[in-house]
From Swiss-Prot:
Additional free-text comment from the UniProt record: The poly(P)- and ATP-dependent glucokinase reactions both follow an ordered Bi-Bi mechanism, with glucose being the second substrate to bind and glucose 6-phosphate being released last. The mechanism of poly(P) utilization is not strictly processive and is most likely nonprocessive, where there is dissociation of poly(P) prior to complete utilization.
Nucleotide-binding as UniProt keyword: yes
Organism this protein belongs to: Mycobacterium leprae (strain TN)
Record region (Disordered): 53-79
SUPFAM superfamilies, A to Z: Actin-like ATPase domain
Protein name: Polyphosphate glucokinase
UniProt catalytic activity: [phosphate](n) + D-glucose = [phosphate](n-1) + D-glucose 6-phosphate + H(+); D-glucose + ATP = D-glucose 6-phosphate + ADP + H(+)
E.C. numbers: 2.7.1.63, 2.7.1.2
Subunit composition and interactions: Homodimer.
Binding site for ATP: 83-88
InterPro entries: ATPase_NBD, ROK
């Protein structure tokens, strides 16, 4: 039996049911297992050093030189993105023609406790270091509707009920801020520039980590605030079955864990008929060890953008209408 675990979750996803049934009816097809893996086209302050990190994940050594491109004016080809995480806050300028960072990104430690004002001040440090004065996008690790935070994960509970968009904008001299869920931002970026760029139709991104985040992209547009990690699958939430943290906790083999992931994917397929699943999170770097073991219908591929996806997706959201 598969159902949404709570009334709140049902309310958040109510709009999805109608959209899915209208747009994807009749498109499910069986995919043989050998086709499953498709080809993948210390506390910060202004007085302290700002760590400037390379976009190359293998060359993340902090440096103290200024960013190589600090243009503070917007154009239709550039945007600025901030990615709020539980341990760090990252930001940079994005070339929106190709979905890549221009120069380096800046990464600061997430303040503890991660209250709205403390995080907003840290975001301002990152933005001001680039001299960026145009609109920007910010990812948030939880549900956000119309700029207002509804849930909190990896940040302080005092976020809930606050207008995060206004709080961050106030620290940036009223710059225009677009705020969206972190998995949604990653889904936007992967759909346009990453693993889903050659696929139209319905794409579902799942990020496997402590929990399971999700994003749904339909014909290039985001259907925001899906919470597939909280789908109930045979008596348990999806993330209690298949988060990568569960694999680590029980020391499961990839084969054992893949069976749990399959159950979650089938549950999603029973509610909608995606054309492609994209796997994100650290475990996606070892996708060749577990994606071929999946037994659901829809092919899954590994995310391509990895650590830059949140920044890129946030920048996209700040410069265009990217949601249904």
């Amino acid at each position: 039996m598969i159902r949404l675990r709570s009334a709140a979750a049902r309310d958040r996803c109510q709009v999805l049911s109608l959209a899915y049934r209208i747009t994807v009816a009749g498109r499910c097809q069986t995919v043989s297992p050998h086709h499953r893996q498709a080809k993948v086209s210390e506390q910060p302050s202004l007085a302290k050093e700002i760590a400037i990190t390379s976009t190359d994940a293998t060359a993340d050594t902090p440096r103290t030189s200024p960013p190589s491109d600090t243009a503070g004016t917007t154009s239709r080809h550039r945007g600025f993105g901030i990615d709020i995480g539980g341990s760090s806050i990252k930001g940079g300028i994005v070339d929106l023609d190709i979905g890549q960072l221009i120069g380096d990104r800046i990464k600061l430690l997430t303040p503890q406790p991660a209250t709205p004002l403390a995080v907003a001040k840290t975001i301002a440090e990152v933005v001001n270091a680039f001299g960026w004065t145009a609109p920007l996008g910010v990812t948030y690790p939880g549900v956000v509707t119309q700029g207002v935070v509804r849930t909190a994960a990896n940040v302080d509970d005092s976020w809930i009920g606050t207008n995060a968009r206004d709080i961050i904008s106030a620290e940036l001299n009223s710059q225009e801020v677009t705020i969206l869920n972190d998995a949604d931002a990653a889904g936007l970026a992967e759909g346009r520039y990453g693993a889903g760029k050659n696929n139209s139709g319905l794409i579902v991104l799942l990020t496997f980590g402590t929990g399971i985040g999700s994003a749904v992209i339909h014909n290039g547009k985001l259907i925001p605030n899906t919470e597939f990690g909280h789908l109930e699958v045979d008596g348990k939430e999806a993330e209690q079955r298949a988060a990568s943290s569960v694999k680590d906790k029980y020391k499961w083999s990839y084969r054992t864990w893949a069976k749990q992931v399959t159950r979650v994917l089938v549950a999603i397929e029973n509610a909608m008929c995606p054309d492609l699943f994209i796997a994100g999170g650290g475990i996606s770097r070892k996708a060749d060890r577990w994606i071929p073991l999946l037994e659901n219908r829809t092919p899954m591929v590994a995310a391509a953008l990895q650590n830059t996806a949140g920044i890129v997706g946030a920048a996209m959201a700040s410069t265009a209408d990217v949601t249904h």
